[in-house]
Design a protein with these regions (language model features):
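Non-catalytic substrate-recognition/targeting regions of SAM-dependent transferases
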Residues: 1-5
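ATP-dependent adenylate-handling active sites, centered on carboxylate activation for C-N bond formation
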Residues: 6-240, 253-270, 278-290
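Conserved S-adenosyl-L-methionine
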Residues: 244-248
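Long, low-complexity C-terminal extensions of enzymes
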Residues: 291-297
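Conserved small/polar residues in nucleotide/adenosyl-binding loops
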Residues: 299-302
Length: 302
């Protein structure tokens, strides 16, 4: 039984642009601030992307002291580490970097699949970095509460929603993503963080913030500005973040892992069985959930 559908908007509200930007800023600040109160040490996941960087920036301003930030990357092509480091330097945080390699990823793969309880290969791949980072945080520090930047994409749009043909199509996709949160990004954050005995807190999921952003006229959320998530970026212009971080586009595979980890998982799955064995496994499925690659087939076996 659903007690509330936060994706449901009876009618879009008609605030003007200055009011929208002010409310986005004030409501997200409030969402971060109320999640800073804890009876255990608090840390922050920092990928170097817009969303986690904003959470860290707000927290640093509110606390008035260096916050503890954590980033992760592969030893070969850590796409986001340099951006996380740039943000940390700007905020003056106590920054920690965890470097992982192919062996660490593959040795944890079955455990992550078990924890997630999903066959979705994208969610599994995106979870590897977060799981290993939280594992390191638990083992190496006393941090037991982590603030993250999840749910911003569902509210303000993914890269592909930049090409939404109409405002209605954008809103429908956003509503679908919000209603399916428990299946993907929130599943990833909840399982990867809590399995390492750490509490996750998600300011972008603040109900007041979500209700407001979902009620913004979708015409204003469409990418008519040459930049995705324009409203969120514009709301935090000023001294919140370096401009190159605030206006940076989201990178492909930017789960702090890079292309090398994706390739490592594919190569590992390819080594497990031949093309003939893969086709035999596919034949055991109906059209529903039929694995389309060896990597996907591997997740079904785990």
């Amino acid at each position: 039984m659903r007690y509330e559908d936060i994706a449901d908007v009876p009618a879009p509200m008609q605030d003007d642009m200055p009011t929208i930007l002010q409310n986005i800023r004030e409501k997200l600040i409030a969402g971060v601030e109320k999640r800073l109160d804890a009876d255990a040490p608090v840390g922050f996941l920092l990928s170097g992307g817009l969303d986690s960087s904003l959470v860290c920036s707000i927290a640093a301003k509110k606390l008035g002291k260096p916050i503890r930030t954590f980033a992760i990357g592969m030893d070969t092509d850590a796409i986001d580490l340099k951006y996380a480091r740039q943000t940390a330097d700007y905020l003056g945080s106590e920054h920690h970097e965890i470097i992982i390699n192919r062996e660490m990823v593959l040795s944890s793969l079955e455990e992550v699949i078990r924890l997630l309880g999903t066959w979705d290969i994208t969610t599994i791949r995106a979870s590897m970095g977060m799981y290993l980072l939280c594992k390191a945080i638990h083992e190496q520090t006393d941090v037991r509460v982590l603030l993250t930047g999840e749910i911003s994409d569902e509210l303000f749009g993914y890269k592909y929603t930049d090409y939404a043909p109409t405002a209605d199509a954008f809103q429908q996709e956003s509503q679908k993503r919000i209603r399916e949160l428990y299946m993907y990004d929130v599943l990833r954050a909840d399982r990867c963080i809590s399995s390492n005995s750490i509490e996750a807190r998600v300011p972008f999921g603040d109900l007041d913030f979500v209700r407001y952003v979902m009620a913004i006229d979708p015409e204003k959320k469409l990418n008519r500005y040459g930049k995705g998530k324009y409203l969120l970026r514009k709301a935090f212009e000023g001294d919140w973040l370096p401009p190159e971080i605030l206006w940076r586009e989201k990178a492909a595979f930017s789960d702090a892992v890079g292309h090398s980890m994706v390739d490592d998982i594919k190569e590992y799955a390819e080594s497990l069985y031949t093309d003939e064995e893969f086709q035999m496994r596919r034949a055991n499925y109906s059209a529903h959930c039929m694995p389309f690659t060896k990597a996907v087939s591997y997740t079904h076996l785990t």
